[in-house]
Amino acid sequence: VVGGDECNINEHRFLVALYANSSLLCGGTLINQEWVLIAAHCDR
């Protein structure tokens, strides 16, 4: 991110972080109450 700003944890409630064994795997976006949209490479 170039020129980005820090934000409060509650400002972007649709963003998701997927972790496994304390390591960040991928990011995602909530598209409704039950579904998270991720990139295809996150499934590996």
Swiss-Prot record:
Major enzyme class: hydrolase
Activity control: Enzyme activity is markedly inhibited by TLCK and PMSF, and moderately by SBTi. Platelet aggregating activity is strongly inhibited by TLCK.
Coiled-coil segments: none
Tissue distribution: Expressed by the venom gland.
Keywords of the record: Blood coagulation cascade activating toxin, Disulfide bond, Fibrinogenolytic toxin, Hemostasis impairing toxin, Hydrolase, Platelet aggregation activating toxin, Protease, Secreted, Serine protease, Toxin
Disulfide partners: C26-C42
Catalytic residue positions: H41
Signal peptide positions on this chain: none
Enzyme Commission number: 3.4.21.-
Modifications after synthesis and translation: Contains 6 disulfide bonds.
Protein's UniProt keywords contain Disulfide bond: yes
Subcellular location(s) per record: Secreted
GO cellular component, one term: extracellular space
Cross-referenced InterPro entries: Peptidase_S1_PA (IPR009003), Peptidase_S1_PA_chymotrypsin (IPR043504), Serine_Proteases_S1 (IPR050127), Trypsin_dom (IPR001254)
Additional observations: Negative results: does not affect the gamma chain of fibrinogen (FGG).
Role this protein plays: Thrombin-like snake venom serine protease that coagulates fibrinogen by inducing a fast degradation of the alpha chain (FGA) from human citrated plasma, and a slow degradation of beta chain (FGB). Potently induces platelet aggregation in both platelet rich plasma and washed platelet preparations in a concentration-dependent fashion. Shows amidolytic activities.
Assembly mode: Monomer.
Protein name: Thrombin-like enzyme F202
Origin species: Crotalus durissus cascavella (Northeastern Brazilian rattlesnake)
Lineage: Eukaryota, Metazoa, Chordata, Craniata, Vertebrata
